[in-house]
């Protein structure tokens, strides 16, 4: 049978770091207040000449090098983002052109913080169906451009960045105990929660980009409560359970949410990859950034069982179980 094997990862961050103390100079907050509630110490902010596209290009190039491939080996590019360079055409098309790819196809996926999980799942479907042999999946965001920097409840949480992964279709034995690649995926959404996390603008309504708005306590409650269902479904689909995990790579929204989710699932803290302290919440870039960090520092190794999960505005949420 065919499985989608992840054979390369990459990441990119803007040059500018923004510490909690620096934020405290223009909004009523403090380092201790932010750390206590979120676990975030700093985040990276894109400069004027850094964009969702430029960060995505950089992350993609690193992933290609990591995989020992060139852009000629890629059939499809899927970009997960809520902060594209333009309303249209897609930022994925811009990245495709910048990388020198004139064959294949590319497009954007918008599922906010769950975007990378949704994009991976779509890429997996293309590979298993034979539509593509190799897919470059990118999560890239510049959320600093849609933040209200006077709102301390949101501006302290988010940062900019990009992460990328390459999926390749490979023939495997069909044994989940040893097969490398994506073993299962589960996606969900519920539009009843639109008012809890959203941008208050759009081309069809206000003709503006709008600012990010969030009901933090509501998001926290639902993040811990609903994400575990797709995780349980992922394990059930292959007859496994969380105790078999080597690594848990969750959406890096808030350290308290991550810890509460891991506790609910019975996952030990030493198996949880946490980068929110250094990156903040980078939305669709969060999971691939954390994944690339753990691969590059040697924590995640071939054969490891890894769970990726995320929840985003809408709400949208999903999980991917993969053997590295």
Curated annotation (Swiss-Prot):
This is Beta-ketoacyl-[acyl-carrier-protein] synthase III. The lineage of its organism: Bacteria, Pseudomonadati, Pseudomonadota, Alphaproteobacteria, Hyphomicrobiales. Catalyzes the condensation reaction of fatty acid synthesis by the addition to an acyl acceptor of two carbons from malonyl-ACP. Catalyzes the first condensation reaction which initiates fatty acid synthesis and may therefore play a role in governing the total rate of fatty acid production. Possesses both acetoacetyl-ACP synthase and acetyl transacylase activities. Its substrate specificity determines the biosynthesis of branched-chain and/or straight-chain of fatty acids. Pathway: Lipid metabolism; fatty acid biosynthesis. Belongs to the thiolase-like superfamily. FabH family. GO terms for cellular component: cytoplasm. Its EC number is 2.3.1.180. The keyword Transmembrane helix does not apply. The active site is at residues 113, 251, 281. It catalyses: malonyl-[ACP] + acetyl-CoA + H(+) = 3-oxobutanoyl-[ACP] + CO2 + CoA. HAMAP family: FabH. It is found in: Cytoplasm.
